[in-house]
C-alpha cells in the first residue's frame, strides 16, 4: 500500500549531474537513485532539488556554480515539462499533483551562494529558491558546519532575517551546535532541518540533540528524517527499517510529531531498504504495520510538510 503522496525535503540529484561531470539533462537517468521514472506512478511526489555549493567555492566562484546549476534546473523543468513542474508554494505543489506531475522545489545547500552579499537573498528568491541550508560541513560567510566550532557570523544572522522576509525557508541541517544556539537567538519564524536525525539514537554530530529538538517543537519547526546510513546508526551498521524507526520513536517521545522525509538521494550511502524512491514509499505500509496510526504515518509521508508549506512558504 503506497501513500497518497510523498514529500522529500532533500536530494543531491541536481548537482550530481554537474559535480560528476555528466550530461546535465539527467533528471530521468536510470543510473541515479532518483529519476523521474523511478518515482512510483501512484504516488503524488514533491521533491526539493538542492544546489549543493562545495565548501571551497566562495565569492564569484560560488555565484557561478549556483547559476550553472540553476540554469540546469530550469532546462530540465522545460525538458520534462509534461512530467514535472517547478513550484514555489503549497498551491503550486497541489496544482502539479492534480496535473499528474512531480512537484519540484529549487533549494540550496550552502549559504556561500550569497557570496557575502545580502542583496543576493532577493535574487535567489526571485529565481524561485524556496529553502537554503545555511552551511555545509565547513565554514562559509554565514557560519560553520558540524566539522568546525565557530557559530553564526553577523552576516549569517542578517541573512536569516532577510530569508525570512523573502520567503526562503531557513534550513539548519549541517549547522554546528554553536550555530544552532545562535540561530535560536536570531530566527523569528519556524525553520526546517531538511535532513537530520536524532543524536540520542545515532551520535553523529550532524544529528539533532534533544535540546535542539525540544526547541524546534516549541517553534513549530519541521524535521526531515535522513536516509544516510551514517546518520541512522553509529558507524552505519545495520540494515533494518527498525533502525530509522527508533529515531521516529525518539522524536515522538520529545513531542516532535512534525516529522517529514529528507532522503539525501544521490548524495549519501543509503541502506538497502531506502535506496530507491519506491522503497521510500514503502515506509508508509511499514509504519502502519508497526502500529503507527494512519494520521501519524501520513503526517511523516506528506501532510506535515504540506501544512508547513502552507503556513510558511
Please give the residue ranges for each predicted region:
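Basic/polar N-terminal segments that are highly enriched at the extreme N-terminus
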Residues: 1-2, 313
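Short acidic/histidine-rich active-site segments
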Residues: 227, 254-277
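Mid-to-C-terminal alpha-helical segments outside catalytic/metal-binding sites
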Residues: 275-313
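Extended, charged catalytic domains and RNA/DNA-binding interfaces, predominantly
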Residues: 2-226, 230-233, 245, 249-252, ...
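A short, acidic, flexible beta-alpha connecting loop/helix-capping segment that sits on the rim
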Residues: 52-54, 267, 302-307
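Second-shell loop/turn segments in exported
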Residues: 60-61, 235-237, 272-274
Amino acid at each position: 500500500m503506497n501513500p497518497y503522496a510523498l514529500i522529500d525535503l532533500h536530494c543531491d540529484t541536481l548537482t550530481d549531474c554537474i559535480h560528476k561531470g555528466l550530461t546535465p539533462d539527467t533528471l530521468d537517468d536510470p543510473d541515479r537513485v532518483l529519476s523521474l521514472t523511478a518515482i512510483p506512478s501512484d504516488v503524488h511526489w514533491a521533491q526539493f532539488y538542492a544546489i549543493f555549493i562545495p565548501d571551497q567555492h566562495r565569492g564569484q566562484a560560488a555565484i557561478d556554480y549556483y547559476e550553472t546549476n540553476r540554469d540546469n534546473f530550469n532546462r530540465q523543468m522545460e525538458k520534462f515539462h509534461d512530467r514535472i513542474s517547478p513550484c514555489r508554494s503549497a498551491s503550486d505543489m497541489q496544482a502539479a499533483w492534480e496535473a499528474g506531475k512531480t512537484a519540484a522545489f529549487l533549494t540550496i545547500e550552502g549559504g556561500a551562494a550569497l557570496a557575502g552579499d545580502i542583496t543576493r537573498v532577493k535574487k535567489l528568491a526571485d529565481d524561485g529558491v524556496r529553502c537554503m541550508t545555511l552551511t555545509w560541513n565547513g565554514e562559509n560567510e554565514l557560519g560553520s558546519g558540524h566539522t568546525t566550532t565557530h557559530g553564526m557570523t553577523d552576516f549569517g544572522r542578517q541573512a536569516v532575517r532577510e530569508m525570512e522576509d523573502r520567503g526562503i525557508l531557513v534550513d539548519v541541517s549541517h549547522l554546528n551546535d554553536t550555530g544552532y544556539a545562535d540561530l535560536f537567538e536570531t530566527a523569528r519564524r519556524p525553520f526546517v532541518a531538511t535532513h537530520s536525525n536524532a543524536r540520542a539514537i545515532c551520535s553523529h554530530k550532524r544529528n539533532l540533540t534533544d535540546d535542539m529538538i525540544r526547541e524546534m517543537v516549541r517553534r513549530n519547526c519541521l524535521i526531515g528524517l535522513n536516509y544516510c546510513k551514517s546518520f541512522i546508526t553509529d558507524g552505519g551498521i545495520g540494515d533494518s527499517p527498525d533502525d530509522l524507526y527508533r529515531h521516529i520513536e525518539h522524536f515522538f517521545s520529545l513531542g516532535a510529531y512534525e516529522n517529514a522525509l529528507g532522503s539525501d538521494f544521490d548524495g549519501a550511502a543509503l541502506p538497502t531498504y531506502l535506496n530507491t524512491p519506491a522503497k521510500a514509499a514503502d515506509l508508509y505500509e511499514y509504519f502502519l504495520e508497526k502500529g503507527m496510526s494512519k494520521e501519524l504515518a501520513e503526517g511523516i509521508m506528506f501532510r506535515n510538510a504540506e501544512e508547513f508549506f502552507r503556513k510558511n512558504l
